[in-house]
């Protein structure tokens, strides 16, 4: 069996790999998207399906007002003592010496739940993980953060003992690692194998310099020695490699005795005419940071990536029978169920009566007008990941605005300051019109402002679609679902990426979704009949 990378396409970063018997799970970060954390299941490490979105209550995750790329950073999923343990950080600040990250622990007897109410685990850092030692003791490992550490690029990894009976941490903190010159040490996990403790961590930052480092010690407190190759995995030295930004590893031994590591990676789009080593030459990644897997071999007591330390497109699978799962492809939601499809997420807050309803008009998603796409508070946006470089997304909408501050339509969204929006609104003297708007680094543009597209008075519905074609995308509209007209504006798909947006705290990926806003306060709504996503 051969595994093709990435194994989780689209925005699925910071994988935490976990095994229960012959079942395998990966938990990934969701940042400001709700519900928090996505957990995937596999029986063969090749075919994965989404089985749980555990942080689905405000009591577990309150992100209203969180900044872009705040929220859930680097969860850690483990299985011990007959239950699953999930650690996570809710980051409240991303662009200062303080993160104000709040760390929590929840548990469940089954991956589907029910998940417990959260136990606070301190606010002193991020990327926490839990290590279950062979003697039953448990340890909490994390990256501390504050003004002192922010100014020191050689960041530290700290360990504290954890008492599961009382849910408390020992006040004694032990420093395990102070980093290498790669800097930005984070995402640490502890393992025990063949009499050694192994500390695995990410370094180099979250972009193209990203890497995995490994250390080992005979004692959990250290001292730890660094891997002979320093970096166990990185793609930094191979700018032409199709899988870039590889790092943030999570190690696992299969029930057949084989070793694998999940890691995050990205597939860049390179712009024509830009030299590979020039600024921007490595490319742009609108699909965000995805999840890959590597096969691991042991030599002289150290783990190595088979085939070399770079991320590889194909990997030999474990010695198990392949268990095919649904392949990400054509997707459709007709909104006939009583809850949103698991592929759909909202921004920062749960889908409830404030945002919309699936029962007010059966067979339709009703979205109530709330804040604009620029908001970080109450926003009626329901969206799904881009998982392909070329796809078509489409919807049919019924919407009757009566004020220019009311709109509804289709959006391609990266964060609150970078998105485009094709929508129906209301113009005095004209009635309903179709427009597009783009927000680029928080700078708006309205290319159809002087000549909006009129919606015929008799049109009960407006169909909207977006066609993404690798580097560019375009919106279209129809008034009968058969005859389509292209909006005469072309947008750059590559701009909806970490790489274009830059700076600190931009770690997600492009989404496509439905949106309704009403800043007039009059309480308008839009009804969406279906939402489709089709790779092309």
From Swiss-Prot:
Keyword Hydrolase among record annotations: yes
Entry-linked CDD domains: GH43_SXA-like
Active site, UniProt feature: 14 (proton acceptor), 186 (proton donor)
Residues making up the signal peptide according to the UniProt record: none
Protein family per UniProt: Belongs to the glycosyl hydrolase 43 family.
Residues under site feature: Important for catalytic activity, responsible for pKa modulation of the active site Glu and correct orientation of both the proton donor and substrate: 127
Catalytic activity, as annotated: Hydrolysis of (1->4)-beta-D-xylans, to remove successive D-xylose residues from the non-reducing termini
Enzyme type, top EC level: hydrolase
A biological process term (GO) from this entry: xylan catabolic process
UniProt keyword annotations, A-Z: Carbohydrate metabolism, Glycosidase, Hydrolase, Multifunctional enzyme, Polysaccharide degradation, Xylan degradation
EC number annotated for this UniProt entry: 3.2.1.37
Coiled-coil ranges from the UniProt annotation: none
Protein name, UniProt field: Putative beta-xylosidase
InterPro entries: ConA-like_dom_sf (IPR013320), GH43_C2 (IPR041542), Glyco_hydro_43 (IPR006710), Glyco_hydro_beta-prop_sf (IPR023296), Glycosyl_Hydrlase_43 (IPR051795)
Gene Ontology molecular functions: xylan 1,4-beta-xylosidase activity
